[in-house]
Protein backbone atom coordinates (compact mmCIF):
# COMPACT_ATOMS: atom_id res chain seq x y z
CA UNK A 1 0.00 0.00 0.00
CA UNK A 2 1.43 3.37 -0.94
CA UNK A 3 2.22 5.88 1.80
CA UNK A 4 -0.39 8.27 0.43
CA UNK A 5 -3.01 5.53 0.80
CA UNK A 6 -1.91 4.91 4.37
CA UNK A 7 -2.24 8.61 5.13
CA UNK A 8 -5.63 8.65 3.42
CA UNK A 9 -6.88 5.74 5.55
CA UNK A 10 -5.69 7.49 8.71
CA UNK A 11 -7.54 10.63 7.64
CA UNK A 12 -10.68 8.64 6.86
CA UNK A 13 -10.45 6.93 10.26
CA UNK A 14 -10.38 10.34 11.93
CA UNK A 15 -13.34 11.40 9.83
CA UNK A 16 -15.26 8.26 10.80
CA UNK A 17 -14.46 8.94 14.46
CA UNK A 18 -15.90 12.44 14.22
CA UNK A 19 -19.02 10.99 12.59
CA UNK A 20 -19.15 8.28 15.30
CA UNK A 21 -19.12 5.58 12.61
CA UNK A 22 -16.81 3.27 14.52
CA UNK A 23 -17.26 0.12 12.45
CA UNK A 24 -15.91 2.04 9.47
CA UNK A 25 -13.17 3.52 11.63
CA UNK A 26 -12.11 -0.05 12.44
CA UNK A 27 -12.03 -0.92 8.73
CA UNK A 28 -9.80 2.05 7.88
CA UNK A 29 -7.39 1.36 10.74
CA UNK A 30 -7.23 -2.36 9.92
CA UNK A 31 -6.02 -1.38 6.45
CA UNK A 32 -3.33 0.76 8.04
CA UNK A 33 -2.33 -1.96 10.51
CA UNK A 34 -1.87 -4.49 7.74
CA UNK A 35 0.85 -2.30 6.20
CA UNK A 36 3.17 -2.59 9.22
CA UNK A 37 5.12 -5.71 8.27
CA UNK A 38 8.30 -3.61 8.48
CA UNK A 39 7.40 -0.23 9.95
CA UNK A 40 5.18 -0.25 13.02
CA UNK A 41 2.23 2.04 13.68
CA UNK A 42 2.87 5.55 14.93
CA UNK A 43 1.55 6.50 18.37
CA UNK A 44 -1.31 8.36 16.68
CA UNK A 45 -2.18 5.36 14.50
CA UNK A 46 -2.19 2.84 17.32
CA UNK A 47 -4.37 5.15 19.42
CA UNK A 48 -6.83 5.49 16.54
CA UNK A 49 -6.95 1.71 16.21
CA UNK A 50 -7.53 1.37 19.95
CA UNK A 51 -10.30 3.99 19.99
CA UNK A 52 -12.03 2.38 17.01
CA UNK A 53 -12.15 -1.07 18.56
CA UNK A 54 -12.94 0.31 22.01
CA UNK A 55 -16.12 1.92 20.72
CA UNK A 56 -17.19 -1.05 18.61
CA UNK A 57 -16.67 -3.54 21.44
CA UNK A 58 -17.92 -1.15 24.12
CA UNK A 59 -21.38 -0.85 22.58
CA UNK A 60 -21.79 -4.64 22.47
CA UNK A 61 -20.46 -5.14 26.00
CA UNK A 62 -22.99 -2.61 27.27
CA UNK A 63 -25.77 -4.38 25.34
CA UNK A 64 -24.72 -7.75 26.73
CA UNK A 65 -24.79 -6.49 30.33
CA UNK A 66 -28.25 -4.98 29.88
CA UNK A 67 -29.68 -8.12 28.24
CA UNK A 68 -28.09 -10.37 30.88
CA UNK A 69 -29.64 -8.28 33.64
CA UNK A 70 -33.09 -8.50 32.02
CA UNK A 71 -32.62 -12.25 31.57
CA UNK A 72 -31.95 -12.70 35.29
CA UNK A 73 -35.06 -10.72 36.19
CA UNK A 74 -37.26 -12.72 33.82
CA UNK A 75 -35.84 -16.00 35.16
CA UNK A 76 -36.64 -14.94 38.72
CA UNK A 77 -40.22 -14.23 37.62
CA UNK A 78 -40.52 -17.60 35.91
CA UNK A 79 -41.24 -16.12 32.46
CA UNK A 80 -39.81 -19.03 30.46
CA UNK A 81 -41.04 -17.79 27.07
CA UNK A 82 -39.33 -14.46 27.59
CA UNK A 83 -36.17 -16.13 28.89
CA UNK A 84 -35.95 -18.27 25.75
CA UNK A 85 -36.21 -15.20 23.51
CA UNK A 86 -33.67 -13.31 25.59
CA UNK A 87 -31.15 -16.17 25.46
CA UNK A 88 -31.41 -16.26 21.69
CA UNK A 89 -30.90 -12.49 21.48
CA UNK A 90 -27.98 -12.65 23.90
CA UNK A 91 -26.42 -15.30 21.68
CA UNK A 92 -26.54 -12.89 18.75
CA UNK A 93 -24.70 -10.24 20.77
CA UNK A 94 -22.14 -12.80 21.94
CA UNK A 95 -21.46 -13.82 18.33
CA UNK A 96 -20.76 -10.18 17.50
CA UNK A 97 -18.48 -9.85 20.53
CA UNK A 98 -16.55 -12.96 19.52
CA UNK A 99 -16.10 -11.72 15.96
CA UNK A 100 -14.81 -8.32 17.09
CA UNK A 101 -12.40 -9.84 19.61
CA UNK A 102 -11.14 -12.39 17.09
CA UNK A 103 -10.55 -9.59 14.58
CA UNK A 104 -8.30 -7.47 16.79
CA UNK A 105 -6.56 -10.48 18.34
CA UNK A 106 -5.64 -11.80 14.88
CA UNK A 107 -4.37 -8.36 13.91
CA UNK A 108 -2.26 -8.15 17.06
CA UNK A 109 -0.77 -11.61 16.57
CA UNK A 110 -0.10 -11.41 12.84
CA UNK A 111 0.93 -7.77 12.36
CA UNK A 112 1.31 -5.57 15.42
CA UNK A 113 3.09 -7.54 18.15
CA UNK A 114 5.74 -9.10 15.83
CA UNK A 115 7.02 -5.70 14.64
CA UNK A 116 6.74 -3.82 17.96
CA UNK A 117 10.23 -2.49 18.65
CA UNK A 118 9.92 -0.29 21.75
CA UNK A 119 8.97 -1.24 25.30
CA UNK A 120 6.07 1.20 25.09
CA UNK A 121 4.56 -0.35 21.97
CA UNK A 122 5.15 -3.92 23.20
CA UNK A 123 3.34 -3.23 26.46
CA UNK A 124 0.57 -1.37 24.62
CA UNK A 125 -0.16 -4.28 22.28
CA UNK A 126 0.24 -7.03 24.89
CA UNK A 127 -2.11 -5.11 27.19
CA UNK A 128 -4.55 -4.80 24.30
CA UNK A 129 -4.26 -8.55 23.70
CA UNK A 130 -5.06 -9.17 27.36
CA UNK A 131 -8.00 -6.77 27.24
CA UNK A 132 -9.73 -8.53 24.35
CA UNK A 133 -9.18 -12.00 25.78
CA UNK A 134 -10.70 -10.60 29.01
CA UNK A 135 -13.76 -9.42 27.11
CA UNK A 136 -14.17 -12.97 25.79
CA UNK A 137 -13.88 -14.31 29.34
CA UNK A 138 -16.71 -11.99 30.42
CA UNK A 139 -19.34 -13.97 28.53
CA UNK A 140 -17.81 -17.33 27.59
CA UNK A 141 -18.57 -20.36 29.75
CA UNK A 142 -16.89 -23.65 30.62
CA UNK A 143 -13.68 -24.56 28.80
CA UNK A 144 -13.90 -21.50 26.53
CA UNK A 145 -14.00 -19.18 29.54
CA UNK A 146 -11.06 -20.97 31.12
CA UNK A 147 -9.04 -20.65 27.91
CA UNK A 148 -9.89 -16.95 27.56
CA UNK A 149 -8.88 -16.32 31.17
CA UNK A 150 -5.59 -18.17 30.72
CA UNK A 151 -4.82 -16.19 27.57
CA UNK A 152 -5.63 -12.95 29.39
CA UNK A 153 -3.29 -13.82 32.24
CA UNK A 154 -0.44 -14.73 29.88
CA UNK A 155 -0.78 -11.50 27.90
CA UNK A 156 -1.02 -9.26 30.95
CA UNK A 157 1.94 -10.98 32.64
CA UNK A 158 4.07 -10.62 29.51
CA UNK A 159 3.17 -6.93 29.35
CA UNK A 160 3.82 -6.51 33.07
CA UNK A 161 7.32 -8.04 32.85
CA UNK A 162 8.31 -5.46 30.23
CA UNK A 163 6.51 -2.56 31.93
CA UNK A 164 8.11 -3.11 35.34
CA UNK A 165 11.57 -3.39 33.78
CA UNK A 166 11.43 -0.59 31.22
CA UNK A 167 8.62 1.90 31.91
CA UNK A 168 8.47 4.43 34.74
CA UNK A 169 5.86 3.83 37.49
CA UNK A 170 4.11 7.01 36.34
CA UNK A 171 4.01 6.01 32.66
CA UNK A 172 0.35 5.99 31.60
CA UNK A 173 0.72 2.70 29.70
CA UNK A 174 2.20 0.97 32.76
CA UNK A 175 -0.55 2.43 34.95
CA UNK A 176 -3.25 1.45 32.45
CA UNK A 177 -1.93 -2.10 32.41
CA UNK A 178 -1.98 -2.29 36.21
CA UNK A 179 -5.54 -0.97 36.24
CA UNK A 180 -6.87 -3.49 33.72
CA UNK A 181 -4.83 -6.39 35.15
CA UNK A 182 -6.32 -5.70 38.59
CA UNK A 183 -9.83 -5.58 37.09
CA UNK A 184 -9.13 -9.00 35.56
CA UNK A 185 -8.15 -10.42 38.94
CA UNK A 186 -11.25 -8.97 40.57
CA UNK A 187 -13.94 -9.61 37.95
CA UNK A 188 -12.76 -12.71 36.10
CA UNK A 189 -10.68 -14.63 38.67
CA UNK A 190 -12.71 -13.37 41.67
CA UNK A 191 -9.48 -12.65 43.53
CA UNK A 192 -10.04 -9.40 45.41
CA UNK A 193 -6.78 -9.72 47.36
CA UNK A 194 -4.63 -9.92 44.25
CA UNK A 195 -6.66 -7.17 42.59
CA UNK A 196 -6.24 -4.81 45.53
CA UNK A 197 -2.55 -5.60 46.01
CA UNK A 198 -1.75 -4.99 42.35
CA UNK A 199 -3.76 -1.76 42.19
CA UNK A 200 -2.36 -0.41 45.45
CA UNK A 201 1.24 -1.23 44.48
CA UNK A 202 0.85 0.56 41.16
CA UNK A 203 -0.78 3.55 42.85
CA UNK A 204 1.88 3.79 45.58
CA UNK A 205 4.76 3.40 43.11
CA UNK A 206 3.34 6.21 40.98
CA UNK A 207 2.72 8.50 43.96
CA UNK A 208 6.35 8.08 45.00
CA UNK A 209 7.52 9.41 41.63
CA UNK A 210 4.78 11.92 40.93
CA UNK A 211 7.25 14.80 40.95
CA UNK A 212 8.97 13.33 37.90
CA UNK A 213 5.82 13.46 35.77
CA UNK A 214 6.13 15.61 32.68
CA UNK A 215 3.35 17.89 31.51
CA UNK A 216 2.69 15.70 28.49
CA UNK A 217 1.52 12.63 30.41
CA UNK A 218 0.40 14.28 33.67
CA UNK A 219 -3.30 14.33 32.79
CA UNK A 220 -3.42 10.71 31.55
CA UNK A 221 -1.35 9.36 34.43
CA UNK A 222 -3.26 11.14 37.18
CA UNK A 223 -6.58 10.12 35.66
CA UNK A 224 -5.59 6.44 35.70
CA UNK A 225 -4.35 6.86 39.28
CA UNK A 226 -7.81 8.20 40.12
CA UNK A 227 -9.38 5.11 38.53
CA UNK A 228 -7.04 2.85 40.52
CA UNK A 229 -8.08 4.64 43.69
CA UNK A 230 -11.77 4.45 42.78
CA UNK A 231 -11.50 0.70 42.28
CA UNK A 232 -9.64 0.23 45.56
CA UNK A 233 -12.40 2.16 47.32
CA UNK A 234 -14.98 -0.04 45.62
CA UNK A 235 -13.19 -3.31 46.29
CA UNK A 236 -12.09 -2.99 49.89
CA UNK A 237 -13.29 -1.74 53.25
CA UNK A 238 -9.89 -2.44 54.80
CA UNK A 239 -8.95 0.80 56.54
CA UNK A 240 -5.28 -0.18 56.45
CA UNK A 241 -5.25 0.44 52.70
CA UNK A 242 -3.97 3.99 52.39
CA UNK A 243 -5.60 5.93 49.60
CA UNK A 244 -4.28 9.35 50.53
CA UNK A 245 -2.90 11.48 47.73
CA UNK A 246 -0.05 13.95 47.82
CA UNK A 247 -1.06 17.61 47.63
CA UNK A 248 0.33 17.85 44.12
CA UNK A 249 -2.16 15.26 42.88
CA UNK A 250 -5.42 16.85 41.81
CA UNK A 251 -8.19 14.28 41.27
CA UNK A 252 -9.85 14.59 37.89
CA UNK A 253 -13.27 13.47 36.79
CA UNK A 254 -13.23 9.67 36.82
CA UNK A 255 -15.35 9.50 33.70
CA UNK A 256 -13.70 7.77 30.78
CA UNK A 257 -11.17 9.75 28.76
CA UNK A 258 -11.14 9.37 24.99
CA UNK A 259 -9.57 5.93 25.18
CA UNK A 260 -11.16 4.70 28.40
CA UNK A 261 -14.02 2.43 29.27
CA UNK A 262 -15.78 2.44 32.60
CA UNK A 263 -17.96 -0.26 34.07
CA UNK A 264 -18.49 -1.57 37.61
CA UNK A 265 -14.75 -1.68 37.99
CA UNK A 266 -12.96 0.93 35.95
CA UNK A 267 -10.47 -0.06 33.27
CA UNK A 268 -8.39 1.74 30.69
CA UNK A 269 -8.12 0.92 27.02
CA UNK A 270 -6.32 3.48 25.06
CA UNK A 271 -3.19 5.53 24.68
CA UNK A 272 -2.09 4.57 28.15
Curated annotation (Swiss-Prot):
PROSITE patterns: 1433_1, 1433_2. It holds the Pfam family 14-3-3. InterPro entries: 14-3-3 (IPR000308), 14-3-3_CS (IPR023409), 14-3-3_dom_sf (IPR036815), 14-3-3_domain (IPR023410). Residues 250-261 have a biased composition (Low complexity). GO terms for cellular component: cytoplasm. Residues 249-272 are annotated as: Disordered. Residues 262-272 have a biased composition (Polar residues). One of its GO terms (biological process) is protein localization. Gene3D superfamilies: 14-3-3 domain. SUPFAM superfamilies: 14-3-3 protein. SMART domains: 14_3_3 (SM00101). Belongs to the 14-3-3 family. This is 14-3-3-like protein E. It comes from Nicotiana tabacum (Common tobacco).
Amino acid sequence: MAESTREENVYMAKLAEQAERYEEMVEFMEKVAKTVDVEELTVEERNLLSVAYKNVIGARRASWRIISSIEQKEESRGNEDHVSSIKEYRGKIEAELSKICDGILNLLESHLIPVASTAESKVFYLKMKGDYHRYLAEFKTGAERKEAAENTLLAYKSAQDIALAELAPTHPIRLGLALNFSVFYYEILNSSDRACNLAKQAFDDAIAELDTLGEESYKDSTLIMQLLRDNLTLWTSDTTVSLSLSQKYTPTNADAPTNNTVHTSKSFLGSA
